[in-house]
Amino acid sequence: MATGPRYKVPMRRRREVRTDYHQRLRLLKSGKPRLVARVSNRHVRAQLITPGPDGDETHVAASSEHLSEYGWEAPTGNLPSAYLTGYLAGMRAIEAGLDEAVLDIGLNTATPGNKVFVVQEGAIDAGVSIPHNESVLADWSRNRGEHIAAYAEQRDEPLYNSDFDATTLPEHFDTVLETIQDADITMNTDADTDNNNSQSVGDNE
């Protein structure tokens, strides 16, 4: 461990690789709600969060785990599910009167076209104003899962262990997106979090 008069012990959550406090401060200075996008290999989560005197407050949330409520049958950790999760969170944000936000990617790497930016694109398309650079957004064909379907067609064996046919993913995406657009959206704040647990979901997984 480093020592010396100039050495500063990092804050606990930074040592645990969970929170980038410099980034958090920049986001808070914007004065806008944070669109907290967190991804793993299996799931995608999105929340609209504002700071408060007693901790962060989660106003709306969406999780790819709940896309099945709208007919989603494909895996929940890919780009299409990330877009749908962001779109669902965006619709709930508009319903809650939140029409602008800033993207909080936590400690995820800011790689153009990755899942956190696809979540952002979904929220933007739902009507939430989020400052962004167009160069980080994925092609629409990738949002629909056309690259996954093309790969599945080249395989002799099914791509997924489930009964879902990956070659139909783009059409399935279109159907579920239309279902979400036509749905009576509720302001769900339950994405495996409570009022002060946005730090755990709102930081790196």
Swiss-Prot record:
Which keywords appear in this protein's UniProt record, sorted alphabetically? Ribonucleoprotein, Ribosomal protein, RNA-binding, rRNA-binding
GO terms for biological process? ribosomal large subunit assembly; translation
Output one GO MF annotation. Answer: structural constituent of ribosome
Asked whether the UniProt record includes Ribonucleoprotein among its keywords, one would answer yes
Entry GO terms, CC = cytosolic large ribosomal subunit
Q: Which Pfam family, an example, fits this chain? A: Ribosomal_L5e
Q: Which Gene3D superfamilies match?
A: 3.30.420.100
Domain of life, source organism: Archaea
SUPFAM superfamilies linked to this entry: Translational machinery components
Subunit field text: Part of the 50S ribosomal subunit. Contacts the 5S and 23S rRNAs.
Family per similarity comment: Belongs to the universal ribosomal protein uL18 family.
Q: What does this protein do?
A: This is one of the proteins that bind and probably mediate the attachment of the 5S RNA into the large ribosomal subunit, where it forms part of the central protuberance.
Full protein name: Large ribosomal subunit protein uL18
Q: Gene name?
A: rpl18
